Design a protein with these regions (language model features):
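A short helix-loop-beta-strand connector motif used in the catalytic cores of GNAT acetyltransferases and
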Residues: 28-48
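Conserved active-site alpha-helix within GNAT-family acetyltransferase domains
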Residues: 96-114
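Conserved beta-strand in the GNAT
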Residues: 39, 46-55, 60-64
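STAS-like cytosolic regulatory interaction modules
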Residues: 114-122
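Conserved acetyl-CoA-binding loop-helix of GNAT-fold acetyltransferases
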Residues: 68-85
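Short glycine-aromatic motifs
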Residues: 1-2, 35, 108-110
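Conserved GNAT acetyl-CoA-binding A-motif
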Residues: 85-96
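Short amphipathic alpha-helix that is part of the acyltransferase structural core
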Residues: 1-25
């Protein structure tokens, strides 16, 4: 897995459009986050597998993202990498998606209410 900035906006928009989650902002809004938008690519093919981004949510650092289907292990590795980079911040994530919840729990996030998960700073 390779993590970097967006390499191809059209590819980014295509993967973003395949996402079935109304909570995800527009592709343009995510790309506008600049240094807080991390794309992850296949080491073998160079294709975009997904994106993790950080936003401010009323003073909380909120981690969100999207990916192509059936790449749980890669998504977990990507989230752990980004979480380690921002280890001095409490990271929150808001979701009701079972697949996202499974990934967050495997990355050390804890459920703190119905749809909110937290990974404490370390």
């Amino acid at each position: 897995m390779i993590v970097s900035r967006c390499r191809d906006i059209e590819e980014f928009k295509k993967v973003h459009a395949q996402c079935e989650n109304d909570r995800i902002p527009s592709a343009e809004s995510i790309l506008a986050l600049g240094d807080y938008c991390f794309c992850f690519y296949s080491k073998d093919t160079g294709k975009l597998l997904g994106c993790i981004y950080l936003e401010d949510d009323n003073g909380r650092v909120c981690l969100s993202g999207f990916s192509v289907r059936k790449n749980y292990d890669i998504v977990i590795r990507a989230i752990k990498l980004i979480s380690d980079i921002f280890h001095e911040d409490d990271l929150y994530s808001l979701t009701d998606k079972k697949s996202a919840i499974m990934v967050l729990l495997r990355c050390g996030f804890k459920k703190i209410d119905d749809e909110t998960y937290l990974r404490k700073a370390f």
